[in-house]
Amino acid sequence: ISVTGGTESTKYLVSGNFFKQNGVVKNNDMERYTGRINLEQKVSKYVNLGVNMTLSRNQTNNVPLGSGQNENASIMVAAAQFNPLLPIKDENGDYTLNSQAAFLPNPVSLLEITDKTMKERLLATAFVEVKPIQDLTLKANFGIDRNYQKRSVYMPKTTLYGQKKGGQADIAQYD
């Protein structure tokens, strides 16, 4: 969605967008929000000011989709290699492991892993344009590009990954 308009001395654009994509694997999706504002103001015959700003936020629910083997197997590799004749859980309610390949995770257990990534970015510029005399324009630009990312991962003890440590949680943050 966007709105544009203005007058002889003011021009503006405001826009926003939302996008959601579900993955082909259960519990895997992505949402993106973006917003943009452009504003230009003619202050006088000699001075123009302007601001352009874009803000985006991406949220992703990840599942193990890597190309590793054994305990690092992706959910697709684990599903392809796991014995389909075994029940999902044993009589104790624990995920069944293949006795001939105990290093291979039960693919259903991988769906219990919580792996969320959130990214935000602000990209902004501002300018001042001055025309002190005919045929001379002075323009100063100022800008910022700010990124933030946070990834939260939880592997419950019911998964092969978390079993070794009684469950594991990690948070990584970049600024």
Name the predicted role of every residue range.
Residues I1, G23-N28, T34, N38-R121, ...:
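Surface-exposed loop/interface segments of Gram-negative outer-membrane beta-barrel transport/assembly proteins
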Residues G5-S9, F18:
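A generic beta-sheet turn/junction motif
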Residues L13-S15, G50:
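Periplasmic plug
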